[in-house]
From Swiss-Prot:
Protein name: Large ribosomal subunit protein bL33
GO molecular function: structural constituent of ribosome
Organism encoding this protein: Buchnera aphidicola subsp. Schizaphis graminum (strain Sg)
Keyword set, alphabetical order: Ribonucleoprotein, Ribosomal protein
GO annotations of cellular component type: cytosolic large ribosomal subunit
Superkingdom of the organism of origin: Bacteria
Recorded family membership: Belongs to the bacterial ribosomal protein bL33 family.
GO biological process: translation
Length: 55
C-alpha cells in the first residue's frame, strides 16, 4: 500500500469569526504553511485564511 502524500488541513479565517475551509495539500511539494485569500461569508468579505491542523 502506498504512503499518502496529501494531508488534510483546515484553512482558518484570520478575522476571528470561526469560519474555516477544509482542503488537502501535498506535504512534500509544499512544506510551508499556506496563506490564501478566500471569502468569509460571516463578514461577507475576502480575507486572509491561514493553515491549521485538523484535530
Amino acid at each position: 500500500m502506498a504512503k499518502k502524500n496529501r494531508e488534510k488541513i483546515k484553512m482558518i479565517s484570520s478575522a476571528g469569526t470561526g469560519h474555516y475551509y477544509t482542503t488537502t495539500k501535498n506535504k512534500r511539494n509544499t512544506p510551508d504553511k499556506l496563506k490564501l485569500k478566500k471569502y468569509d461569508p460571516i463578514i461577507r468579505k475576502h480575507i486572509l485564511y491561514n493553515e491549521g491542523k485538523i484535530k
